[in-house]
Amino acid sequence: AVPVAIDALVVVVNQDNPLAGLNARQLDAIFSVTRLCGGALSPHSWGDLQLTQPGWAQRGIQRFGRNSASGTWGFFKQQALCNGDLRRDVGEYPGSAAVVQAVAGSLNGIGYASAGFHLSGVKVLPLARDENNWISPTAENIRSGRYPYARPLYIYVNKAPDKPL
């Protein structure tokens, strides 16, 4: 396997959502049923995440993500949920573009996707491993390793060891 690129997992909300960012425990609490990263009780409304703007405190949270056949799903489960289990009410989609489209179409939506997709209609949230030291998924933060949810992508070559490429 040869590393050829870097991908980042991003968390997106509808573009009208006033949420400023999330830390690892909040992300775990939103998406996980087991909360192995230390997330508190699962938030049911945006008010549970301290959104106090008019009209947001009582709004329910609608969750979107990738299906289990996806490497993005596995990476999210490993890194964002500390290998915990996803909630059953996370809508599963076959591609990151579909997740982004679902979040863009739901005022209450939150989802995770690969950063490499067109992110129209959504807001990308800065994320933090600790409390609120949020880091945006800029190209520089991803490349430098500062952004906490980045990973290398590999190309695999199937050839006999004693044969040239």
Predicted segments, located by residue:
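Flexible loop/hinge segments at secondary-structure junctions
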Residues: A1-L165
